[in-house]
């Protein structure tokens, strides 16, 4: 039986949609007869200290915890609460990678395949170490492509840094065994713009394992947005257009991110901005909204959609 270790930054009980996708994919592998474990961080996006007190997460050793998702064992590397400061965030990534790599080296005999999910973008370093140092079969799932996203959103303005990061990322993509992307367009981009061999790229489309919400009993002019409030989402642009519209639509926002405070300042009679809200509560609010908003900066196409 092949022993596969999934490696992701986020995973349940952290209430992040990408983390749940990873957990659901891992669980399907397990149901199909593979020996699966997950290596991820402790909850940091929607941080809740109670998960350490209600036995959802149990301590194994210093800065290492364990939990489970359905029938899949999860190993959690301790991470502090997510910072929206860019410099602090990069330091958090480095700290997470350092502890992850130490774990992989120490437990190298417990897995045959490492299946890595690409956020943060510096996960390519782990992919290189897995393949070149540990000599493991390595699968790299790319949902968002960097440095293209950072460049288009002007998050990185140094051409030298962009060029060096792209070389590093391309090196990782070329030496690993398989690449998984979430759209046919991203596959074509990697082939045509990055020079990646077509036969090593597979496509797994994004999906939802949640039940469909019931349709609202009465149609109204209420729009709901739930999720990340960062630069890529560009919610501010939609709010400005909504405020300039003669139609009396109401927008309710639930989320967190680097742009939350700025978006909060844009509240008005028709714009209601709320912090992160538990999923069970969100589902109650969706019942009263006729429309759902999916927002993405117009400068992003294949590099970040549908990953964003």
Locations of regions flagged by a protein language model:
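Membrane-proximal helix-turn-helix segments that form the acceptor-binding/catalytic region
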Residues: 105, 122-125, 129-133, 159-179
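Nucleotide-sugar-dependent
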Residues: 233, 278-308
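A short, active-site helix/loop in glycosyltransferases that binds the activated sugar's phosphate group
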Residues: 166, 170-200
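Carbohydrate-associated surface elements
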Residues: 42, 185, 204-207
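N-terminal subdomain of nucleotide-sugar transferases
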Residues: 1-62, 240-246
């Amino acid at each position: 039986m092949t022993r596969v270790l999934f490696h992701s930054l986020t995973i349940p009980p952290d209430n992040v949609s990408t983390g749940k996708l990873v957990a659901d994919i891992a669980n399907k592998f397990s149901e199909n007869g593979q020996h699966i474990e997950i290596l991820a961080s402790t909850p940091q996006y929607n941080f809740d200290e109670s998960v350490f007190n209600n036995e959802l997460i149990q301590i194994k050793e210093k800065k290492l915890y364990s939990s489970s998702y359905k029938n899949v064992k999860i190993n959690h590397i301790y991470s502090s609460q997510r910072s929206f400061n860019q410099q602090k965030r990069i330091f958090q990534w480095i700290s997470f990678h350092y502890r992850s790599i130490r774990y992989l080296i120490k437990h190298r005999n417990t897995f045959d395949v490492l299946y890595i999910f690409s956020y943060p973008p510096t996960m390519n370093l782990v992919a290189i170490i897995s393949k070149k140092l540990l000599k493991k079969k390595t699968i790299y799932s790319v949902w968002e492509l960097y440095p293209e996203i950072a460049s288009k959103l002007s998050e990185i303005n140094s051409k030298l840094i962009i060029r060096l990061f792209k070389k590093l990322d391309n090196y990782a993509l070329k030496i690993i065994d398989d690449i998984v992307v979430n759209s046919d367009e991203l596959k074509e981009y990697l082939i045509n713009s990055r020079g990646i061999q077509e036969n090593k790229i597979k496509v797994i489309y994004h999906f939802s394992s949640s039940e469909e919400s019931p349709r609202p009993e009465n149609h109204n002019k209420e729009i709901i947005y739930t999720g990340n409030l960062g630069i890529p989402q560009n919610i501010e642009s939609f709010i400005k257009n909504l405020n300039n519209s003669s139609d009396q639509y109401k927008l309710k926002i639930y989320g967190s991110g680097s742009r939350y405070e700025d978006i909060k300042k844009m509240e008005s009679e028709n714009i209601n901005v709320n912090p992160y809200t538990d999923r069970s509560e969100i589902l109650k609010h969706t019942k009263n909204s006729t429309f759902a908003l999916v927002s993405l900066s117009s400068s992003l196409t294949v590099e970040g959609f549908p990953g964003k």
